[in-house]
Regions:
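Transmembrane-helix signature of polytopic, membrane-embedded enzymes
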Residues: 5, 90-116, 131, 147-150
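Extracytoplasmic catalytic/substrate-binding loops of multi-pass membrane glycan-assembly enzymes
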Residues: 22-39, 48-64, 70-73, 218-226, ...
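Juxtamembrane membrane-water interface segments immediately following transmembrane helices
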Residues: 35-38, 169, 193-264, 439-454
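Hydrophobic/aromatic-rich transmembrane helices and adjacent perimembrane loops
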Residues: 41, 126-132, 160-164, 169-173, ...
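Membrane-interface anchor segments at the N-terminal boundary of transmembrane helices
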Residues: 73-77, 120-121, 276-350
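Transmembrane-helix motifs of polytopic, lipid-linked glycan transferases
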Residues: 77-98, 134-136
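Membrane-embedded, lumen/periplasm-facing catalytic core of multi-pass transferases
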Residues: 94, 229-243, 405-455, 460-472
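Signature aromatic-anchored transmembrane alpha helix within multi-pass, membrane-resident enzymes
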Residues: 102-105, 148-155, 175-176, 194-205, ...
Length: 532
C-alpha cells in the first residue's frame, strides 16, 4: 500500500512540475483551439458553433468558465488540466491491463513530459483520448458481459463524436456489436438487460436532440475541406514548393490540380485516381514513420532530454541489455500461453480507433490524429509487460526492486523541474493581456488574421484582411469602419510590402487612430482615439 501512495505522489508531483508555471513559458496558440474556446465562452443551446465543431468540448469550456471568468486564464487552465488528465488516464489504462505499479508510473510520467502531451494542438483531441482510455480501462476492470461493454463503448464513441465528429463511426460500429450481443445474451441477462439498454437509449437520444448528428449533417463537411487542404500539403511536398499560406489559396491549388468538379475523396477517386492513390500511399508511409517517431520520442527522447552526449545511445542500449538479461524467458512464454488476449476487449479498442486510422490514411497523419494511435501502442506494451517475468535476484526483493524503480523515477522528475520552472517570451499572450485591459466605449470593428477577437471582453465584428484589395488602406479602414487593428509580427509581414499600408503609417493620426505598443516583441495596436 505504501508503494501505491509513493506512486501516486510521484505522478501528482510530475503533473505539478509540468503545468505549475505553464503561463510563464508557453505562449497562446491560435487555430481551432481558440475557435472552441470562443464557442465555450458564448455557449448556448441550440449550439451555434455547428455540430461538427465540438459542442461537447465547448460545453466543457463553458462549465469551467463559470469558475474562471478571464478567458486567457481559462485557456491556460484547460490546457494544464487536460495535460494532467491525459497522464492519469495513461496510468489507469496500463494498470487495468495488468502492468506493474512501477512500470505503469514510468510510462505515465514519460507520456506526461513527452511532446505528445502539452505541445499537442488543438487540445480538443486529448478529451476523447482520455475518454477512450477511461472506458477501455473500465471494461477491463469490471466483469461485464459483452453486451454491456459495447453499450458503454458505443456511448463513449458518441461522446467523442461531439468533440471530433469522425468518432460517430465508432458509435455506430459499437452499437451494431452491442445489438448482436444483446440478442445473443438476452436469455442470460434478462433482469438487467433492458435497464442498461434503456439508459443507453435515453442518453443517446438526448445527445442527438441537444446537438444533432455530428457526421451526417447538412453543414459544411469538415472532412471534405480537410482532405482538400492536406492533399495540397502532400502535393507541395511532391513538387518541392512552398505550401499556400491561406485556406483560399490552398483550395484554389487543389482545384487547379484535381479539377473544378472534384470536391470529396469519392470525386477524387473517380476523376483523379492517380493523384488520389499517391496521396493515400504517401499518408500510409507518413503514418507508420510518424508513429514510430512518436514511440521513440516518448520512451527515448523524453527520457534523455537535456543530455545530448554521444554516450546516451550507449546508455540506452546498456539499459535494454540489462533488462533483456533479467527476463525469465521460460516463465514469460508460459505466461503468454496462459493469458490469451481479451479478444472482444481488443475489438472494442479497434472500434474506438478506426476513425483515426482511416483519417490518417485518407486525409493526413496529423498529430491530433496520431495521439489516438498511441492507445494501440500502449495496449501492445501493456500486453507484453503484463506477461513478462523477471529472474529472481537474491540481493533485491520484489518490493525493493519496485521501490528502487520509483525512486529513480522521482529523481528523473526532480531533474525536469528547471525545464518547466522558467520564463520564456509569450508575445501572443502579452498581446491578449494588453487588449483585454482596454475598456472601449464602442463596439469593436477588428481587422486581424488571428483569433484575438475571441479574448475581447465584448462582442466584436471581424473584418477579414482578404477584403482589402484596392490598394488604398486608409479608404478601406474608413469604408469598413475599422477601429481596432492589432499589428502583430504576422500582420506586419502580411502588409509589409503594401504601399497603401505604408501610406497609412504616415497618416494614421489624421484618421483618428493612436498607436500603442502591446508587447516587447514589436507588436502594436492601432485603435481609434474615440474608443479610449
Amino acid at each position: 500500500m505504501r508503494l501505491h501512495w509513493f506512486s501516486i505522489f510521484i505522478l501528482m508531483t510530475a503533473s505539478l512540475v509540468l503545468v505549475h508555471y505553464l503561463p510563464f513559458w508557453k505562449d497562446v496558440e491560435f487555430g481551432d483551439e481558440t475557435t472552441y474556446l470562443g464557442s465555450g465562452l458564448s455557449f448556448s443551446i441550440p449550439f451555434k458553433g455547428g455540430v461538427q465543431w465540438g459542442p461537447l468540448y465547448a460545453a466543457w469550456y463553458a462549465f469551467w468558465h463559470f469558475f474562471i471568468p478571464d478567458s486567457l486564464n481559462l485557456y491556460y487552465f484547460n490546457w494544464a488540466l487536460l495535460s494532467v488528465l491525459a497522464g492519469i488516464s495513461v496510468f489507469i489504462f496500463v494498470r487495468s491491463l495488468g502492468v506493474s505499479l512501477a512500470a505503469a508510473t514510468w510510462i505515465a510520467v514519460l507520456f506526461l513530459f513527452s511532446d505528445q502531451n502539452v505541445p499537442l494542438n488543438p487540445k480538443i483531441s486529448i478529451a476523447p483520448f482520455c475518454l477512450i482510455l477511461g472506458v477501455l480501462a473500465l471494461i477491463q476492470l469490471r466483469p461485464w458481459s459483452n453486451s454491456r461493454r459495447f453499450l458503454v463503448i458505443s456511448l463513449v464513441g458518441l461522446l467523442c463524436a461531439y468533440c471530433r465528429p469522425e468518432f460517430y463511426i465508432s458509435f455506430l460500429l459499437a452499437l451494431i456489436i452491442a445489438v448482436f450481443w444483446l440478442w445473443k445474451e438476452k436469455g442470460i441477462l434478462q433482469p438487467t438487460l433492458m435497464r442498461w439498454a434503456g439508459v443507453f437509449v435515453i442518453l443517446a437520444v438526448g445527445l442527438h436532440l441537444l446537438f444533432g448528428n455530428p457526421l451526417f449533417t447538412g453543414d459544411d463537411n469538415r472532412s471534405t475541406v480537410a482532405f482538400q487542404q492536406h492533399f495540397v500539403v502532400n502535393y507541395s511536398a511532391w513538387m518541392n514548393q512552398p505550401e499556400p499560406s491561406t485556406i483560399e489559396a490552398q483550395l484554389q491549388l487543389f482545384h487547379k490540380v484535381m479539377g473544378e468538379n472534384v470536391h470529396t475523396l469519392t470525386d477524387a477517386i473517380k476523376m483523379q485516381p492517380k493523384w488520389t492513390f499517391k496521396h493515400i500511399t504517401t499518408n500510409i508511409v507518413h503514418t507508420v514513420t510518424a508513429n514510430l517517431t512518436n514511440v521513440v520520442s516518448i520512451f527515448y527522447q523524453t527520457l534523455f532530454r537535456g543530455w545530448y552526449s554521444p554516450w546516451r545511445m550507449g546508455v540506452a542500449a546498456g539499459i535494454a541489455l540489462v533488462f533483456l538479461f533479467l527476463i525469465d524467458y521460460k516463465t514469460t512464454v508460459r505466461n503468454f500461453r496462459k493469458n490469451p488476449v481479451d479478444g472482444w476487449g481488443f475489438v472494442g479498442l479497434i472500434t474506438l480507433l478506426i476513425p483515426t486510422l482511416i483519417a490518417t490514411v485518407l486525409i493526413y497523419p496529423r498529430t491530433h490524429y496520431l495521439i489516438f494511435h498511441l492507445v494501440l501502442v500502449l495496449w501492445l506494451i501493456a500486453y507484453v509487460l503484463s506477461r513478462l517475468s523477471l529472474r529472481k535476484v537474491k540481493i533485491m526483493q520484489p518490493f525493493s526492486a519496485a521501490f528502487l524503480a520509483l525512486l529513480v523515477l522521482s529523481i528523473f522528475v526532480t531533474i525536469r523541474v528547471p525545464e518547466y520552472h522558467r520564463k520564456a517570451p509569450t508575445p501572443t499572450a502579452d498581446n491578449v493581456r494588453f487588449i483585454t485591459q482596454l475598456t472601449p466605449k464602442e463596439r469593436l470593428r477588428v481587422l486581424e488574421r488571428d483569433w484575438y477577437r475571441v479574448f475581447l471582453k465584448d462582442n466584436s465584428d471581424w473584418i477579414h484582411v482578404e477584403e482589402y484589395t484596392d490598394g488604398d488602406f486608409a479608404k478601406f479602414v474608413r469604408d469598413k469602419n475599422i477601429n481596432f487593428i492589432l499589428m502583430t509580427q504576422d500582420m506586419q509581414s502580411y502588409f509589409g510590402k503594401d504601399a497603401g499600408f505604408a501610406s497609412f503609417l504616415n497618416q494614421y493620426k489624421s484618421e483618428g487612430f493612436v498607436k500603442l505598443p502591446t508587447n516587447s516583441e514589436g507588436a502594436y495596436l492601432f485603435i481609434k482615439q474615440s474608443l479610449l
